[in-house]
Amino acid sequence: MKVMERWFNVGKIVNTHGIRGEVRVISRTDFPEERYKKGNKLYIFRECDTEPIEVTVKSHRVHKSFDLLSFEGYDSINDVEPFKGAMLKVPESQLGELNEGEYYFHEIIDCTVVTEAGETIGKVKEILTPGANDVWVVRRQDGTDALIPYIDDVVMHVDPERKIIIIRPMEGLLE
């Protein structure tokens, strides 16, 4: 593993679940079904360790607002108890390619949003996933938030390298 590799947070282990080695995870990944697929490698980062612990996903299921994961070789509550409070991460090399028009959250967060007319709206501070399409929360220069739906009629161009998003606001969108 490269020492200088960038790591991306995909979840936080907040507790154990049951006695068979499952952990409760608050997910921070864009694609939980993909990221937590059986056989995938994840890395556990604990404050007390100098190196991450590599684990292999044995099972994944959703329970209430949590993702429940179990790992190969960690079969009891005693095995996973030390992981409480730890972060689950993946190296940048594991992110994989996306289809055209798809972006990882970290590519969109902190992008500057500008209208086609050149008016700067603000920076994307978070992404909501309420249903049919994502909604980008943009912090305006006056401190208020604008909600920008990620749909073709509004988002004209995304340039993650330059951290610029060009939009065509619908009537009333920015009021």
UniProtKB/Swiss-Prot annotation:
Subcellular location: Cytoplasm
Domain PRC barrel, chain residue ranges per copy: 100-173
Paired cysteines (S-S): none
Keywords: Chaperone, Cytoplasm, Ribosome biogenesis, rRNA processing
A single GO cellular-component term on record: ribosome
Pfam families for the chain: PRC, RimM
Keyword Transferase (UniProt): no
UniProt keyword Metal-binding, yes or no: no
Gene Ontology biological-process annotations: ribosomal small subunit biogenesis; rRNA processing
SUPFAM superfamilies associated with the record: PRC-barrel domain (SSF50346), Translation proteins (SSF50447)
Primary localization: cytoplasm
Top-rank lineage group of the source organism: Bacteria
InterPro entries assigned: PRC-brl_dom, PRC_barrel-like_sf, RimM, RimM_N, RimM_N_sf, Transl_B-barrel_sf
GO molecular function, one term: ribosome binding
PANTHER family: RIBOSOME MATURATION FACTOR RIMM
Subunit architecture: Binds ribosomal protein uS19.
Function noted in UniProt: An accessory protein needed during the final step in the assembly of 30S ribosomal subunit, possibly for assembly of the head region. Essential for efficient processing of 16S rRNA. May be needed both before and after RbfA during the maturation of 16S rRNA. It has affinity for free ribosomal 30S subunits but not for 70S ribosomes.
Domain note: The PRC barrel domain binds ribosomal protein uS19.
Family, as annotated: Belongs to the RimM family.
Protein name: Ribosome maturation factor RimM
Organism: Geobacillus thermodenitrificans (strain NG80-2)
Lineage, top ranks: Bacteria, Bacillati, Bacillota, Bacilli, Bacillales
